[in-house]
Amino acid sequence: MKTSLLIAGSLALVPMTYAQDKPNIIIILADDLGFSDLGCFGGEIHTPVLDKLAKNGVRMTQMYNSARSCPSRANLLTGLYPHQTGLGHMDGSHPAWPKGYSGFRSNSDNVTIAEVLKDAGYFTAMSGKWHLGNKSNPILRGFQEYYGLLGGF
C-alpha cells in the first residue's frame, strides 16, 4: 500500500517537473501609463504588486511606444512596426486621410506572440480590450481563452 502511494505520488509530480521547464509569461499593457508611473521605474505612485512582478521577472526597458493604443498593441503582439502589422494609425474615419489608405485592419499573416507560445505548448489567455480591428479576434490569433471587449470602448 505504501509503495503504491509512493509511486502514485511520484507520478503526480512528473507534470510539475515539466511545467517548471517553461517560465510563466505575463505581459501587461496599460494605455496611457508613463514609464515613471510605476514604483519599479522610480515613480511616486505606490505599486507594490507590480514592483514585485518586476523584481522577480523581466523588465522591458528598451521598448518604444510607437503610437497610442491600437498600433502599440499590434506592435507588442507581433514584434513588428505598426504599419507592418496593418495598424499604422487609429482608424480610417478621419476625413483628411486618402480613400483606401490602410491602417485599421490587422493583417492576419502576421504571427502573434500568442500563436508562437501556443505552438510551444503554453496555455494562452488574454483579458481586456482587443482593439485590433473588426475582422480579427483573439481566439483566431492564438489565444485559447479571451475575456474582454473586441472594440476599444
Q: Where are the predicted features?
A:
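Formylglycine-dependent sulfatase
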Residues: 2-4, 18-153
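Sec-dependent N-terminal signal peptides
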Residues: 3-15
